[in-house]
């Protein structure tokens, strides 16, 4: 102990190589019955400079995650997983969380179109956002995972991601038409029913298939590697939704990893554990390089 009463700490290496800074804005404007409807984004960006001042080396480019926040296709609150995004940015990833229109303002595939427009924006503003456009992943949770999967499995080559992360997303709306949970899953007022225009899924199975990520998986399809994580005790979206996607990917010989979060529900719990973020990070690093 020093003479002034202080204790000395020395020799500790930095365990947080990047500071981060925050940026938000509008990536597109839609027409909504004659009024302008901005679609927003925020980005959490690594920097080796001072986030309150200089951004450091402007030539740096980072692997990037474009994130779609789940909401049951209602209006999103983009910052629900903000802590996850900051932690990932501290580890050297740009994270861009993007708004898509809710049902009532669009019908499927409007939200997928919005997401892909956001990805195009990220490509066009790569220098500003510090994005390495050759190393982009998609990630979403719940309805946002459905959007991320649909975008990943249907994107043109220029916008196709290197991989996609699915946290407890609906993947098979035809199967959903037969399932039960603690919430309405498939009627005209259900989230999926309203996404498709206020329908009963069982009465419109062709449309349900068209809106299902599993329907785009085939041996000859270009499908990016997929990480699936789903709570084994999900009270809202049956775990079997992720089983259906996993089996379709496996049978088509596509690269897939699947984790059952035993005892966990629809987000929260283990999904807020740093060990789970470590699994996601390891997958992203392996796929993005």
Regions found by a protein language model. Name each.
Residues 1-289:
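Alpha/beta-hydrolase superfamily serine-hydrolase fold, recognizing
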């Amino acid at each position: 102990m020093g003479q002034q009463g202080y204790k000395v700490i020395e020799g500790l290496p930095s365990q947080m190589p990047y500071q981060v800074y925050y940026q938000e804005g509008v990536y597109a404007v839609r027409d909504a019955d004659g009024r302008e409807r901005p679609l927003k984004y925020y980005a959490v960006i690594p920097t080796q400079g001072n986030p309150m001042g200089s951004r450091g080396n402007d030539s740096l480019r980072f692997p990037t995650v474009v994130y779609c926040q789940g909401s049951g296709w209602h209006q999103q609150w983009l910052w629900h997983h903000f802590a996850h995004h900051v932690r990932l940015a501290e580890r050297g990833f740009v994270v861009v969380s993007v708004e898509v229109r809710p049902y009532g303002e669009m019908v499927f595939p409007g939200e997928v179109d919005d997401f892909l427009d956001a990805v195009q924006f990220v490509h066009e503003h790569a220098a500003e956002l510090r994005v390495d456009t050759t190393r982009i992943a998609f990630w979403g949770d719940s309805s946002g995972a459905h959007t991320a999967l649909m975008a990943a499995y249907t994107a043109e080559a220029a916008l196709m991601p290197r991989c996609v992360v699915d946290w407890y997303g609906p993947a098979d709306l035809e199967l959903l038409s037969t399932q039960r949970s603690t919430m309405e899953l498939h009627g005209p007022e259900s989230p999926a029913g309203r996404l498709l225009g206020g329908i009963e899924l069982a009465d419109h199975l062709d449309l349900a298939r068209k809106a299902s990520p599993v329907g785009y998986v085939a041996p000859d399809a270009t499908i990016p590697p997929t990480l699936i994580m789903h709570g084994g005790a999900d009270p809202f979206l049956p775990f079997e939704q992720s089983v259906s996607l996993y089996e379709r990917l496996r049978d088509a010989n596509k690269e897939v990893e699947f984790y059952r979060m035993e005892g966990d529900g629809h987000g929260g719990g283990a999904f807020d554990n740093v060990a789970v973020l470590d699994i996601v990070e390891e997958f992203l690093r392996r796929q993005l390089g």
